[in-house]
């Protein structure tokens, strides 16, 4: 199995992390033509360790590009999160998808579950930016950067990441620059 994602970045920092990823990801359909996991994006106005269901339709939406994520939100000065999405049976995956209004309709989540689907491709304004994919559960989402490598299928947290970097301040900050390492 691949060790890099659709952006050419390592899936995880360690070999064990890559194994844990594939154990969690399984035979998910959210892969590129080379079988590498696709990276999706979600913009938000606050720090997140997990994403919750929409208050309207019960789905959790992600865009195929950072631009699509930013256009789909009113976040403004927020953060954009790159994530992996695990979805084994996606409604509309091979076709044009389902209209956003239909996906947000009352009872649509129940229809997906009854139909055996765990995600839906959504037709919306983000289509010009690569499209939108919505999943049913927070456990289907994991961070594509800085993940600790656990990829716990029962944990809705997108990351259990360890500290990623440091800031080194000189003794006299007026005479030497600070160094930020990531």
Locate each region found by the language model.
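Active-site and NAD+-binding cores of ADP-ribose-processing enzymes
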Residues: 1-182
């Amino acid at each position: 199995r691949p060790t890099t994602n659709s952006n050419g970045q390592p899936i995880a920092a360690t070999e064990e992390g890559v194994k844990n990823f594939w154990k969690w990801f399984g035979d998910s359909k959210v892969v590129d033509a080379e079988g590498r996991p696709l990276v999706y994006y979600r913009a938000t106005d606050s720090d997140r360790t997990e994403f919750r269901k929409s208050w309207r339709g019960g789905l959790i939406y992600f865009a195929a590009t950072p631009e699509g994520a930013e256009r789909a939100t009113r976040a403004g000065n927020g953060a954009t999160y790159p994530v992996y999405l695990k979805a084994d049976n996606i409604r509309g995956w091979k076709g044009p998808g389902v209209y956003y209004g239909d996906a947000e309709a009352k009872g649509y989540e129940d229809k997906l579950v009854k139909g055996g689907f765990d995600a839906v491709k959504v037709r919306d304004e983000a289509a010009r930016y690569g499209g939108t994919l919505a999943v049913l559960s927070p456990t289907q989402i994991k961070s594509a950067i800085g993940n600790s490598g656990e990829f716990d299928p029962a944990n809705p947290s997108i990351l259990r990441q360890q500290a990623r970097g440091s800031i080194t301040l000189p003794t006299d900050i007026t005479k030497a620059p600070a160094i930020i390492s990531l």
